[in-house]
UniProtKB/Swiss-Prot annotation:
The keyword Amino-acid biosynthesis applies. This is 3-isopropylmalate dehydrogenase. It comes from Nostoc sp. (strain PCC 7120 / SAG 25.82 / UTEX 2576). One of its GO terms (molecular function) is NAD binding. Substrate binds at R98, R108, R136, D226. GO terms for cellular component: cytosol. Gene3D superfamilies: Isopropylmalate Dehydrogenase (3.40.718.10). Catalyzes the oxidation of 3-carboxy-2-hydroxy-4-methylpentanoate (3-isopropylmalate) to 3-carboxy-4-methyl-2-oxopentanoate. The product decarboxylates to 4-methyl-2 oxopentanoate.
């Protein structure tokens, strides 16, 4: 029986349209193989939306996304819009999208692919086999807590204030996603906080610990954030799934990403309690190579695989895409950002063609 899904495509800016085209081609092939029918709808976001409508997230785009099963986003931003006021820049489109879809969980995988292990700046024996998922709370914590702002004291001195706030319900909902994610992986969850100093982290640790009683099959551990950062570099293979707050997750997810040596290979997902999630590569819009057929589409393709796995419950189709990525790398196909001696240099379209051939063979 054919499964039907409505997918909103947000190509965005820079290399976005190029890498999105590859991901769509891959999804169409996998759809045929697994009897999945995709109804793709394209909408504007970021700089492209500013140029066309004057705002980074048109209401029509948000409405289209809300009526989708999932949203596949490519890239946002570029030099062209850097002179705009901060609240009018392309990046505001992504923040508005997350808020409008009520997305509170950001999933950032960091996996060392054996074909690219030498791209890491760490020793082979340290990073070989690393496969980490960072689950970051996305809508609370110090980035959104109030009071906030820069104030003038009675003595005329400037005083900057930000407030780190989490409620029980906010902690519980991100905790459940983290436990469920760990359960689907290797059954280990590390909660990262600063409970030795911060009251808000003490509540975080208490709630995560209480929640663990509902997941006896998941092994829970706790680390302070400073130690977690050190352990990520010292012995990253000890980690399976990490859950943490907004600020700590912002930092640790980027640190984990660079264990792989190529941020151009990394996908991500932003999820809510219900409704569509947003799936996108970690990398930026790379306006310096836009339109030159030099972009690496693999992170976009892997984001499509995450969409299949986490939004559409199609793990076999996701596996098929991930295996195709490994196959093209194994046969030596590379884009310019991951090229090494003896490998085959391909452009964005060429890498897409190679993926389609790999999917057809498997």
């Amino acid at each position: 029986m054919t499964q039907n899904y409505r997918i909103t495509l947000l190509p965005g800016d820079g290399i976005g349209p190029e890498i999105m085209a590859v991901a769509v081609d891959v999804l169409k092939v996998v759809g045929q193989q697994f009897d999945i029918q995709f109804d793709f709808q394209e909408a504007l976001i970021g700089g492209a939306a500013i140029d066309a409508t004057g705002e980074p997230l048109p209401s029509a785009t948000l409405d289209t996304c809300r009526h989708s099963d999932a949203v596949l986003l490519a890239a946002i931003g570029g030099y062209k819009w850097d002179s705009l006021p901060p609240h009018q820049r392309p990046e505001g489109g992504l923040l508005g999208l997350r808020a409008g879809l009520e997305l509170f969980a950001n999933l950032r995988p960091a996996q060392i692919l054996p074909q690219l292990i030498d791209a890491s700046t760490l020793k082979r024996e340290v990073v070989e086999g690393v496969d980490i998922m960072v689950v970051r709370e996305l809508t609370g914590g110090i980035y959104f807590g109030k009071p906030r702002g820069i104030f003038t004291t009675e003595t005329g001195e400037k005083r900057g204030v930000n407030t780190m706030v989490y409620t029980e319900s906010e902690i519980d909902r991100i905790g459940r996603i983290a436990f469920e994610t760990a359960r689907k992986r290797r059954g280990k969850l590390c909660s990262v906080d600063k409970a030795n100093v911060l009251d808000v982290s003490q509540l975080w640790r208490d709630r995560i610990t209480n929640l663990s009683q509902e997941y006896p099959d998941v092994e829970l551990s706790h680390l302070y954030v400073d130690n977690a950062a050190m352990q990520l570099v010292r012995a990253p293979k000890q980690f399976d799934t990490i859950v943490t707050g907004n600020l700590f997750g912002d930092i640790l997810s980027d640190a984990a990403a660079m264990l792989t040596g190529s941020i151009g290979m990394l996908p991500s997902a932003s999820l809510g309690a219900s409704g569509p999630g947003v799936f996108e590569p970690v990398h930026g819009s790379a306006p310096d190579i836009a339109g030159q057929d030099k972009a690496n589409p693999l992170a976009q393709v892997l984001s499509a695989a995450m969409m299949l796995r986490y939004a559409l419950d199609q793990p076999q189709a996701a596996d098929k895409i991930e295996q195709a990525v490994l196959q093209v790398l194994e046969q030596g196909d590379r884009t310019g950002d991951i090229i090494s001696v003896g490998m085959n240099l391909l452009g964005c379209r060429g890498m897409g063609d190679s993926l389609i051939k790999a999917l057809a063979k498997s």
